[in-house]
Amino acid sequence: MNLIRHSALALAATTALLAGCATAPAPKEPVTLRVVAFNDLHGHLQTAALNLPHPNPASTAANPAPPLRVNVGGTAELAGLVKELRKGAPHSVVVSSGDAIGGTPLISAIFFHEATIDVMNRIGVDVAALGNHEFDAGAAELQRVLAGGCRPAQPGDTAMSCALGRHEGAKFPHLAANVLKADGTPLMAPAVVKTYGGIKVGFIGAVTRGTPTIVVPSGVAGLRFTDEAAAINAEAARLQAQGVQAIVATIHEGGFNDAAQMEWNSNACPGRRGEIFEIEKRLAPAVDVVLSAHTHQGYACVMDGTSKGRPVMQALSFGRGVSVLDLVLDPATGDVDRSKSVYRNLPVFNARTEAAHRELIIGQEPAPLATALRAAVPDADVAQRVAAYTEKAKPLADRVVGRIGGGFDTAANRGSSSAGRLIADAQHAATMAADRGGARFALMNPGGVRAPLPCRGTPPCEVTFGDVFTMQPFGNSLVVMTLTGAEIKQMLEDQQRAGRTNPSFLLPSKSLSYRWIAKAPYGQRVQDLRIDGQPVDPAAAIRFTVNSFMADGGDGLSLLRQGRERLGGELDIDALVSFLKTTPSPSADERVVIVND
């Protein structure tokens, strides 16, 4: 294991911060720096059935038409677009805004995410922020993956380290200004300084301070996550003291643009909401750009509505798009001239993209970006590397493990999704026997459902291990515990958290049902709570199942840490594989009835 090289990257970044870069003649003309950013790759290396919504030109107020679904994605295609965008810019930088690894399809997880780091090196990533999912396997494993070297084999491993030769680690620094070790020192370099045409530019990284509530506790043991804005502002002040005026913050936190969800290049963002916009309000004026992530949305908001406003960007997820920022650096001040800078989100076209969709979008872009979109082809080196990993994973990925009577999707419909209900039913089935815990119901967290389970062809459709793993990749175990009926009701009441507009509904098995009264005060929203059709006695001791992430208080479910008479069970993916042998079909049963009146 080589932890030295990645530490050296961090040390070099910090040294650059403190010492500044070698003095260079000040440029006489403005310097344009092209920033190409992507976020939340989540190990989606292959070209798959991914899409982005785009406004339908045939839609009118009188005759609205559904949005276009534009096929996009794939890291070979992403690398090809990056290459074309860099061709058109003498000065450029590629940034990843976190969650490149963790919560991934099998092709990344089966190689301990070394495949994703390998591909990012080949794409040419220059700077990355940490995301919450980088901590899924703990800080020590994160540092190993970034530094390089082979992971020692463990009993029962199905994953492979150094599958295509020695893992070289990341050839770019990972930044986290707000993640501190127990002794108060930073886990990673907080920032890095790079020079373009004689002008220094600082890049500061941060991750959502809510990471400890959405990552298994063992993954963040001994770490402290501080306020994002405060950490970035402190780092920006240090950068300015070193003569760095142009500052880019890459923050693994995000938001939404509710009023124009498909208008990912609208600068106005009238319906914007979410944590990143609250953070932006508290950032020092010295920060010129905010590259965001985490919510898998697309937006290009300019915050004060003027040409001098600060942009806040995000480019969806899974390599479906990139944010492109042409930052004009003023030679007199060394700062970003926001009035002359350009901010756009671009799709990553692939072979599945319809020609009409491609031409429609290209026609809406300024000439230099349109040229890059039209010229981009899949990068051969990345394509070959992904193919090699795919072939290595094929024996396990292609193994048929069950059948389904129809497709299960992740779209939330009145607080639930068919994919989430499937997983909850599988976990209940695995633990309802007395000798397996005697669970009366099961609950699944929506964030743990990572992908739909498609039915390809005529039902019953075969399901492979790769399909199941992509849907549920975290490797949690099942935990049966006891709470009283009153405690269970309180846990469900807590789905609506203070400061949040909408509740985050847990996904129940079919044995649990209730009504959610949206406009009722806290403590009165959950009504008619039933198990197997019978009202729940508040005083009764009730056994139920959750995954180990939830049982440890993940997703803010602190009450579950009080669960009594715990019994550990099998892995969540094993429970799902067993359930698929019954050929389940999607059900339309309403387990949670939402009343908005």
Task: Enumerate the language-model features and the residues they cover.
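Non-catalytic terminal accessory segments
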Residues: C21-F38, A62, P66-T75, K83-A89, ...
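Acidic, metal/ion-coordinating pockets
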Residues: A22-N350, E354, L422-A429, A442, ...
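Bacterial N-terminal signal peptides that target proteins for export
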Residues: M1-A10
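Intrinsically disordered, low-complexity segments enriched in polar/charged small residues
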Residues: A10-L11, N257
